[in-house]
A protein has these predicted regions:
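Short, well-structured N-terminal submotif of metal-dependent ribonuclease cores
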Residues: 1-69, 75-92
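Short amphipathic alpha-helical segments
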Residues: 145-153
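Histidine- and aromatic-rich ligand-binding microenvironments
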Residues: 24-27, 65-66, 143-146, 166, ...
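PIN-domain endoribonuclease scaffold, especially VapC-family toxins
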Residues: 50-64, 68-140
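Residues that cap or flank secondary-structure elements
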Residues: 44, 142-143
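Acidic, PIN/NYN-like endoribonuclease modules and their adjacent C-terminal/linker elements
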Residues: 1-17, 152-185
Length: 185
């Protein structure tokens, strides 16, 4: 295993990723595939993310995705659809109520189509996360949410480079990199 690096996204250049496996965190998938810039990123950041994605494809990197990331993507997209539906219709529906709305299927089908699109370009890994084998889970879970614990463990085990804009990864691993990270400072 080579040296692990932290690369600030603004300093990313083609060839920075030395690992063969790359993981795009949920927030990156949203920026790359979900319409409307819901994360309100600057055009400069969006262009960098596009560059990273294109470089990975051109360099033949194996882009993997695990089910917790797909789940986070669906849940976030669902929340955005619900919020937009409520705002546009002057409603205050909850998730279960929204599912019963006549237009729900349109939103749901759209979200599933986006997931199908990026899933067809990546390798969906059937990752068996073993919670009991995480020796420093108490420390990591002080800074990471549980899904991020799963993602970081996967990246470490797969020797993968994680592309994320979630500062929790930087804060948790900056002094003791277990895997390479491309993120914001």
């Amino acid at each position: 295993m080579g040296q692990k690096t932290f690369t600030e996204i603004n300093n990313y250049r083609s060839g920075v990723i030395q690992e063969n496996v790359v993981i795009f965190d949920t927030n990156i998938l949203i920026d790359l595939f979900y319409p409307g810039n819901i994360n309100r990123r600057s055009q400069q950041i969006l262009n960098k993310l596009d560059d990273i994605y294109i470089d990975c494809l051109q360099q033949g990197k194996e882009i993997k995705i695990i089910i917790p990331i797909v789940s986070e993507f669906y849940n976030l997209a669902f929340k955005v659809a619900l919020d937009n539906y409520n705002r546009n219709n002057g409603l205050r529906l909850k998730r279960k109520q929204f599912r019963k709305e006549p237009n729900f299927n349109i939103y749901n089908t759209g979200i599933i189509s986006i997931i199908d699109n990026f899933s067809s370009q990546f390798k969906i890994e059937q990752y068996k996360f073993n919670y009991n084998n995480i020796v420093d889970k108490e420390t990591k879970l002080l800074k990471l949410d549980f899904t991020d614990l799963i993602i970081s463990t996967f990246c470490e085990e797969e020797n993968a480079c994680l592309v994320t804009l979630d500062k929790d990864f930087r804060k948790t691993f900056r002094r003791n990199l277990k895997f390479s990270i491309i993120s914001n400072w």
